[in-house]
């Protein structure tokens, strides 16, 4: 790589990171405005977006209830899907984003790494969501609607790759679900 190529690569990484994190922050801030004043909503939106994208899992919701993470949003698709998307996009990495940007939906042109990452991610998401649903729909998710059960099954599948987000009480998961998480 020449120095110009390295500079271009770094710019793309920083630009892509900023785009994804700020998009997530904007969406989360708009949602948090329903429950918080403007400054807290902006701060929480930015903080949680960066935390999710970097797969850190840190959250500030303990202010509302100790050890709560984002459990108060267990039935909110905007929060759950935005944080899930940020975790997944941050987790698949820059080279996969770049391949997707360069080749669009033309899968034949993807690098082997991109094909493997996307395939493994899809299998894990589908399989994990199905298994969490089967393990928890009559237990932890029993009081939820079918849509909420699927949403939380999906979120339970996405979040083990982070250090701490949860929308349901992980301590109340069945042994099978806990095993699936590891």
What residue spans do the PLM features occupy?
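Membrane-proximal intracellular helices of multi-pass ion channels
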Residues: 1-182
């Amino acid at each position: 790589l020449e120095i110009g190529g390295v500079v271009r690569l770094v710019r793309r990484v920083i630009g892509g990171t900023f785009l994804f994190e700020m998009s997530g922050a904007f969406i989360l801030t708009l949602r948090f405005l329903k429950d918080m004043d403007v400054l807290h909503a902006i701060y929480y939106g930015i903080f949680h977006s960066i935390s999710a994208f970097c797969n850190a899992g840190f959250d500030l919701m303990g202010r509302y209830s100790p050890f709560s993470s984002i459990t108060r949003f267990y039935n909110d698709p905007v929060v759950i899907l935005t944080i899930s998307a940020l975790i997944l996009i941050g987790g698949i990495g820059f080279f996969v984003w770049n391949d997707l940007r360069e080749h669009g939906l033309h899968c034949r042109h993807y690098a082997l790494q991109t094909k493997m990452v996307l395939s493994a991610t899809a299998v894990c998401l589908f399989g994990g969501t199905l298994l969490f649903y089967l393990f928890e729909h009559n237990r932890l998710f029993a009081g939820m609607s079918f849509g909420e059960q699927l949403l939380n099954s999906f979120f339970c599948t996405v979040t083990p790759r982070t250090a701490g987000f949860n929308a349901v009480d992980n301590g109340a998961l069945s042994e099978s679900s806990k095993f699936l998480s590891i």
